[in-house]
Amino acid sequence: SVGFKAGVKDYRLTYYTPDYETKDTDILAAFRVTPQPGVPPEEAGAAVAAESSTGTWTTVWTDGLTSLDRYKGRCYHIEAVVGEENQFIAYVAYPLDLFEEGSVTNMFTSIVGNVFGFKALRALRLEDLRIPPAYSKTFQGPPHGIQVERDKLNKYGRPLLGCTIKPKLGLSAKNYGRAVYECLRGGLDFTKDDENVNSQPFMRWRDRFLFCAEAIYKAQAETGEIKGHYLNATAGTCEEMIKRAIFARELGVPIVMHDYLTGGFTANTSLAHYCRDNGLLLHIHRAMHAVIDRQKNHGMHFRVLAKALRMSGGDHIHAGTVVGKLEGEREMTLGFVDLLRDDFIEKDRSRGIFFTQDWVSMPGVIPVASGGIHVWHMPALTEIFGDDSVLQFGGGTLGHPWGNAPGAVANRVALEACVQARNEGRDLAQEGNEIIREACKWSPELA
């Protein structure tokens, strides 16, 4: 007599369990599934659960040596997507023990590592993840978080202002440092290395770090405010990255930066640990995110990447603008902005939030609005993002006809005007342009 029947078997027999009650410790995922024609949604959903946990395409005799009931992912609910034919949201619950503690890398390898090339699916998108406290507590999270950052910078009650130094490639270190100084001197809080500035022949990283540090100290001395420049520590190896972070710390600068998707979560988590241990703030740029999150029916939504970053660690992360040159729908953006900053976020499907997320006491991340924004967007940005944000104007500062410093002045004046107007109870959405025009009377740079 044979122990079990060989051959291909339906996943839904084992992995589709509509009556499963999810546990508080389960990691829950919401997938947008587009099955191939002829594949029933239950089978597609079960296939996702199986291939991203314990399953394979047939029964193997070693299945008898483990408890599938304890370790299998389960597709516990399927709903049709309104307005799309043949698209479904499949909800999958993963037992906590499938994941290594404190490793975003392993979490993604398990949940999205294998299943996206699956034949029975035409397309697959991970829309949201519910991270249980039992798992999130195994992560350090952001090196410092919003409150500690405000205390370090001594800046309260307003958004922070930044600017990416352009042209992003081709400046010498000395001219680069000069641009940094002018922007900070004019009134910005931060300037930023572009994400592609690492250590190229025209400007090696050490030279850039030195000139930028000089610019920071000079601007601090002249303005009496704490200034920062996001020194991009991203490098070809983790060791080199940490070496750059150490050099930044020795120069006494407040903040470094990392491209977390191109650099990878393992490198990012290492850097975040270094930053907490050594009092550096960590700015995160999301270069490469659109490769993963741009397609509506395949890939991963950015809110998942944002949650992962909060666990891996970063104090700032780019989060779209809602108003500038890059796409991003307002409600969705606000949804993951809350996921980055708040402690407890209610499920809210209208904002794309599929699960109630409780971060317990993990520090928050400051969202950075950046990309094609300028002073006329300031009222909208102040209203949408609130105080705990960084507003970054690249061309919006350096494009000023009088130069960088006046561009910085214009931005700072506009910001202060908006914050003051808001605190006086005026409606930024309605009177935004009027507020900016009034401010122009006091500031020739803005006019």
Curated annotation (Swiss-Prot):
Coiled coil: none
UniProt-listed Enzyme Commission number(s): 4.1.1.39
Active-site residues (renumbered): K166, H285
Cofactors (names): Mg(2+)
PTM annotation: The disulfide bond which can form in the large chain dimeric partners within the hexadecamer appears to be associated with oxidative stress and protein turnover.
GO function term, MF aspect, one: monooxygenase activity
Main location: plastid
Pfam families: RuBisCO_large (PF00016), RuBisCO_large_N (PF02788)
One GO term describing the cellular component: chloroplast
Protein residues bound to Mg(2+): K192, D194, E195
Record family assignment: Belongs to the RuBisCO large chain family. Type I subfamily.
Classification via HAMAP family: RuBisCO_L_type1 (MF_01338)
UniProt name for this protein: Ribulose bisphosphate carboxylase large chain
